[in-house]
Amino acid sequence: MAATAAAVVAEEDTELRYLLVQTLENSGVLNRIKAELRAAVFLALEEQEKVENKTPLVNESLKKFLNTKDGRLVASLVAEFLQFFNLDFTLAVFQPETSTFQGLEGRENLARDLGIIEAEGTVGGPLLLEVIRRCQQKEKALTSGEGALDLSDVHSPPKSPEGKTGAHTPPSKIPRYKGQGNKKTSGQQPGAKKASNDASHSDTSISSSEPKSRSGLHLLAHETKIGSLLSNNSLDVNAKAGPGPEEDDLEGDSFFDDPIPKPEAAYGWRSEPSKQAGSLASLSDAPPLKSGLSSLAGAPSLKESESKRGNTVLKDLKLVNDKIGSLGLGTGEEDDYVDDFNSTSHRSEKSELSIGEEIEEDLSVEMDDVNTSDKLDDLTQDLTVSQLSDVADYLEDVA
């Protein structure tokens, strides 16, 4: 009977299960449950594939650092710090990220590697704190040692290579005596004076060698002579000046303390009161001109009356003609001295007029020029023809 009862219950359960499935299927609940289960299974499978194929996070710089001895030592110090204060959660994150589950040294090994002796003072803190204390003590010792060295360097005088202390001698502010430079400057002065004297003597010889008996020279010749005197004067001044000394040599040079030499000594010229200022011979010994025609102030002025000048000129012409005729100078073939002052220096042909007529023509031209230029009377003075000297009518240099 028991077997029949069990068989009846099993049939009832099957019928009930069938009835339940049919009811749930008709209501749509069974299909929804199947879909949710199916989706959950697919999601679980996909997530499993992602976890398996996921690349682990690797820090290359940290990996290279931990491969060194110092890197492992630093990681061990940090891990020992976390273990000392029981920071388990932080340590649980630190070890996976750094991949240091193995290979880190304990406290005893770290103390031995760092040379730290475990004492009462060091047990109360992590090893990282002791390392920092020792670094600070070393820095203080170095700074105190450098300060002592700096003070010794400042207070101790510098030593020579032989070991002796050398005294520091400040630079002297007294200028050096330049005696040799002054000697050179003083040695150049006689040479400059000698050159100026030679130039002045050459000017005198050149002027004295010119013919003195010819009183009818052209105005162009007179201007050429004045230009040569001006050029010679500039040469004399330049030769006397010489090279300028330096500022250092000017202070102790005795040349600038001497008085200025007189014109007689500097230019070799001395005025002769016996000769008249208006004669032709006085032009040869005249001093070098300084500026323009201002040195001709000693000549007779041009403001005399025309009648007096005309009488004087006529008398001079008569005397010159008489002397030339007595000496027989007007007959031979002679050079025209006016051409000597020209650049071509050609020989002039024999003139049909006599020398006296040429002089008269020159004088007439000069008189006309003087009369037409009254505004330049103060600046220009005529020295071409003047009254002849009573001492000698004709002068000639004797070699």
Swiss-Prot record:
Residues 70-102 form the LisH domain. This is Centrosomal protein 43. Belongs to the CEP43 family. The keyword Phosphoprotein applies. Required for anchoring microtubules to the centrosomes. Required for ciliation. Residues 197-209, 286-302 have a biased composition (Low complexity). The modification Phosphothreonine is found at residue 143. Residues 245-256 have a biased composition (Acidic residues). InterPro entries: FOP_dimerisation-dom_N, LisH. Homodimer. Part of a ternary complex that contains CEP350, CEP43 and MAPRE1. Interacts directly with CEP350 and MAPRE1. Interacts with CEP19. Interacts (via N-terminus) with CEP350 (via C-terminus). The gene is CEP43. The keyword Protein transport does not apply. It comes from Bos taurus (Bovine). PANTHER family: CENTROSOMAL PROTEIN 43 (PTHR15431:SF9), FGFR1 ONCOGENE PARTNER/LISH DOMAIN-CONTAINING PROTEIN (PTHR15431). GO terms for biological process: cell projection organization; microtubule anchoring.
